[in-house]
């Protein structure tokens, strides 16, 4: 885990002097927060250019955070496990990442809750190198293979372990490789660093278009997710420390208002219109390919920020089947403390 001092130094270098005050402990706040409102918010995104986390940057691009009176600084950390560490240390006030971290952290006696649940499917795709596609036809063929995940302890790691466990395999039966995302993932698949791996758009679209990779399992849709995981698996969320949520309800409400407004905007516009609002450098594989990646993934987002009632239970079931942190502790997890709809209900 990064030390708090290191993270603060990084934030101070990346942000303006005023924004760097986000390094104060998010769980206690300051005088401005005593009244329940603190309009300066730092949010870590688990890969800001990933389409599965598109609502975060799109909200900023549309100006909805500012219209709520918020000064939001979006930071990026491709590995979800590292993003949660920065939240726990108090150096950011929220994370846009997978919901499953709230369950995993509760078993470590940390209270983290999703305040806006933007998707009930992972949006992840298990890709296989084209020259290995004839040998790896399903997760049962993972044995002896090098499998790429964003990083150990990330949601891609969780899901990979679960897919393997359904075939009677454990993580000892294959080699887990930290492959990151984007160009690092593509390079790993191309040069043989991994045989298969889990990633998202726009990386998926680039691999398929170039012929370097083929889709093995597609969890960008409800149908594909249920086939792979036996039910819904909530992913993209804004999760925050419970103490911060309790101390700053006005700020959290404003964040929910902005994000839900974006979700509704997404459902009212085409992939082309969405792509046009995003930073040009997000389309580093080409504009048409970026539009396709949005079109292939955008259906994962809901329009209201609410959690599907059955989804948390399936996440707990998945984690409880293999995760050393959760396995055997399922009965101690209080799912009602891992998410709330009270803010999106008012948005």
What are these regions (language model features)?
Residues 1-40, 347:
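Short, low-complexity disordered leader/linker segments with a strong preference
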Residues 29-170, 175-179, 195-201, 212, ...:
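Short, glycine-/small- and polar/acidic-enriched structural segments
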Residues 50, 77-81, 150, 154-155, ...:
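Soluble non-cytosolic domains of exported or imported proteins
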Residues 54, 62-63, 85, 89, ...:
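Solvent-exposed, polar/charged alpha-helical surfaces in well-ordered, non-transmembrane soluble domains
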Residues 67, 134, 138, 220-231, ...:
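Short, solvent-exposed loop/beta-turn-alpha elements that line the ligand-binding surface or hinge
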Residues 184-187, 191-279:
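Pocket-lining segment of extracytoplasmic ligand-binding domains
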Residues 245-325:
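Secondary-structure end/capping motifs
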Residues 313-347:
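Conserved C-terminal helix/tail region of periplasmic/extracytoplasmic solute-binding proteins
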